Amino acid sequence: MKKYDFETSLDRRNTSSTKWNIKKDEISLSLADMDFKVASEIEEDLKKVISFPIYGYVDISEEWYSAYQKYFLDEYDLKIEKEEMMFSLGVVPSISSSVRKFTDVGDNIVVLSPVYNIFYNSRVNNFRNVIEVPLLRKEDEFFIDFPSLEEAFKDEKTKMIIFCNPANPVGKIWSKEEMKKLGELAKKYDVLVLSDEIHGFITRTGKKYIPFFSVSEINRDISLTCLSVTKAFNLAGIHTSCIFAFNKDIYKKINRQINTDEVAEPNILSCTAAVSALTKGKDWLY
């Protein structure tokens, strides 16, 4: 296994870094951004793209599709068809597009708090209501309050739950049983599950996240999944993400919306970064 340097922290001040665009004596606690180098394999692949001196429009590469397919087949024995995948510039744009497509102004969106603040921003920016269902805590574990969740789902204005899997910021890796129960409740009350799985590639040693859609046929049918390599591989500045949707109606709707919102076309580095991370980054990650 190749050795990587995770001890040297690079000075990112004066590089337009959002994380480090602060005053001299301030401490940056704002973003989940790493300060050591990306995997050298990814760096080299990106350099190859840049070395060709034309930076025009690009299409989604076949390698992009096959890299995600191979990863989930190898890691989870899950077969995903090309027609069940779509490119998006980022998980956050995908969430906002989903909110606009699958809910209306004044509808309710459920979140399990505490959770990533952007989930609230997507609501505010699109004039939806957020219903918080606080997680239950027992010692060092967090659990879903299913009775309270069901009450939130019973409201006829509730159309969606944005589910963070694994949970950010508490780090909870949800069990199959928890996600199966969530899927059954969502099905019962006709609530769409948007599963944000951007942190699925990076978990504690010995702990492996479970894709929401993999738990049951119900979960597969009533959800869409948003994920990206950007958090795990420190590539957030290169806009690249993926959406999985297995229900054909859901697929058609979100595919139309991300195209309407103009977030469905890659930049010149988007596909290469994802392919390199998925096919060459495992040693760096583990």
What are these regions (language model features)?
Residues 60, 222-286:
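PLP-dependent aminotransferase class I/II
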Residues 2-90, 97, 280:
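N-terminal small-domain helix-loop-helix segment of the aminotransferase-like
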